[in-house]
Amino acid sequence: MINLILLGLPGAGKGTASEQIVDKYHLAHISTGDMFREAMANKTPVGLEAKSYIDKGDLVPDEVTAKLVEERLGQDDVKNGFILDGFPRTTNQAELLDEITTHLNKQLTNVIAIDVKEETLIDRLSARFMCKNCGATYNKFSKKPKVEGTCDRCGGHEFYQREDDKPEVVKNRLEVNEKMNAPLKEYYDKKGLLATVNGEQAPEKVFADIDAILSKD
């Protein structure tokens, strides 16, 4: 069984790699964002508790998020293993996750960090642009519209770049994320769970490296 966390800064390719891993290994892809939305929509006790913080503009306490993760890891589709997305983000959350996985007997088997240089990430993230009409997302390098200047989805001709995709904002966002990411990598390295792959490569090569790590165990 594979119980996995992928670590990496925004733009490192975690989303693409997650999809490829789920397709091959049939793992449950557990996203904390999706969990919050689902729990709040279904008005579960933990969902309502989380909503009370979000409605006030407060951060949801780690213990509440951990309850949500524990509920989700107890569901049937997790029997083949899981890949966690968006949790843990801090060492405190990592310790809570250890308690949960030990209690459920679903201990982590792998933590894989996708490493990409800051300048590459800035290039990737600041290359994003969107259709003004329908919000479809494109990338100057990897996902251009099929017809230049025309949105594939709605046929619109006006595009814009979000404020938080501008290079100086992206750089700041990456620095904030790295401050959170570095202690997590150290935490899992000490536990002997951490492996690192080179995220500068093409997505299929990144996946091949991840696949080699997962197949080995």
From Swiss-Prot:
SUPFAM superfamilies: P-loop containing nucleoside triphosphate hydrolases. Its EC number is 2.7.4.3. Residues 127-165 are annotated as: LID. Residues 31-60 are annotated as: NMP. It comes from Lactobacillus delbrueckii subsp. bulgaricus (strain ATCC BAA-365 / Lb-18). InterPro entries: Adenyl_kin_sub, Adenylat/UMP-CMP_kin, Adenylat_kinase_CS, Adenylate_kinase_lid-dom, P-loop_NTPase. It is found in: Cytoplasm. Pfam families: ADK (PF00406), ADK_lid (PF05191). It catalyses: AMP + ATP = 2 ADP. Zn(2+) binds at residues 131, 134, 151, 154. Gene3D superfamilies: P-loop containing nucleotide triphosphate hydrolases. Pathway: Purine metabolism; AMP biosynthesis via salvage pathway; AMP from ADP: step 1/1. Catalyzes the reversible transfer of the terminal phosphate group between ATP and AMP. Plays an important role in cellular energy homeostasis and in adenine nucleotide metabolism. Monomer. PROSITE patterns: ADENYLATE_KINASE. The lineage of its organism: Bacteria, Bacillati, Bacillota, Bacilli, Lactobacillales. This is Adenylate kinase. GO terms for molecular function: adenylate kinase activity; ATP binding; zinc ion binding. Belongs to the adenylate kinase family.
